[in-house]
């Protein structure tokens, strides 16, 4: 018997690829009457900067705070477009939005367990505004290290129009 999906972890790097994957998470949540946990992992402030010069630490801290603000704005933009496209209010489906400092793979696995998620949804081969590859090697590593079902969603073919960014 296939277990019922009650909670979906949607991990995002805020790329077009992961925004498209959000449609899948919304569709799954609506179909299964499930909730969505949205999470994004950000590289933490380097420990050496904490004890280093105050100026460098402040720059790193400001960059972190700026990234958090961009993340929240981006999630809002993606949600509005997803709502218009799917006809479903994603706000009603989202149970939590998390921004975690740390390695994306480690944080995805931790959040999936902490939030008791039944499945994980990822976009494939995304590249976020921090210009680090996120959901190519990340999706592979998550697949290898979790016992939960993982949905890796590629962008549609070039013939398909996707207005997400």
Question: Model-found features: residue ranges?
Answer:
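Redox- and metal-dependent alpha/beta enzyme cores, enriched for Fe-S-associated oxidoreductases
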Residues: 41-44, 70-72, 83
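Small/aliphatic-rich secondary-structure junction motif
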Residues: 2-58, 87, 165
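Gly/Ser-rich helix-loop-strand patches that form or flank binding pockets
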Residues: 4, 110-162
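A short acidic, glycine-rich active-site loop
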Residues: 57-73
